Amino acid sequence: MRMYETIFIVQPDLGEEELKGISARVQEVIVSMKGELKRLEDWGARKLAYPIEKFNRGRYYYLRFDGDAALIAELERRLRLNDKIIRYQSVKLEKEAPAAAAIPAKVTEEEPVEAAPEAKVETTTEEE
């Protein structure tokens, strides 16, 4: 299984019951497709960079989960069909990179570079 993250934006004027229903349906899709939900965060209502479907604000949700390509296809299909969700995006995460301290830095000593001599610029003016 691969790790994915999805951010989706719902309409800002939804009630708490509708928001709980949307997040429950998203969790249900992940579990039914044999995925493993790692994190579900409600980032709250934020101003959108540009109006989407005549909304200037939206409520953001963040998901991180393990799954396969079929899970992503089904999740995005369900997000697309829900009229209350105005945008979504899923990305596949790469494996965790080793910490920067674990990678030795390659130090090389270079000879100091001498400054280039200043170029003289001659200006000529023609008098007529």
UniProtKB/Swiss-Prot annotation:
Family the UniProt entry places it in: Belongs to the bacterial ribosomal protein bS6 family.
RNA-binding keyword on record: yes
Key words, A-Z: Ribonucleoprotein, Ribosomal protein, RNA-binding, rRNA-binding
GO molecular function, one term: structural constituent of ribosome
Residue segments, region Disordered: 105-128
NCBIfam families per record: S6 (TIGR00166)
Function description: Binds together with bS18 to 16S ribosomal RNA.
InterPro entries: Ribosomal_bS6 (IPR000529), Ribosomal_bS6_sf (IPR035980), Ribosomal_S6_plastid/chlpt (IPR020814), Transl_elong_EF1B/ribsomal_bS6 (IPR014717)
Organism: Geotalea daltonii (strain DSM 22248 / JCM 15807 / FRC-32) (Geobacter daltonii)
GO cellular component: cytosolic small ribosomal subunit
UniProt-listed PANTHER family: MITOCHONDRIAL 28S RIBOSOMAL PROTEIN S6 (PTHR21011), SMALL RIBOSOMAL SUBUNIT PROTEIN BS6M (PTHR21011:SF1)
GO biological process: translation
CDD domains hit by this protein: bS6
Basic and acidic residues bias (residue ranges): 117-128
Record-given protein name: Small ribosomal subunit protein bS6
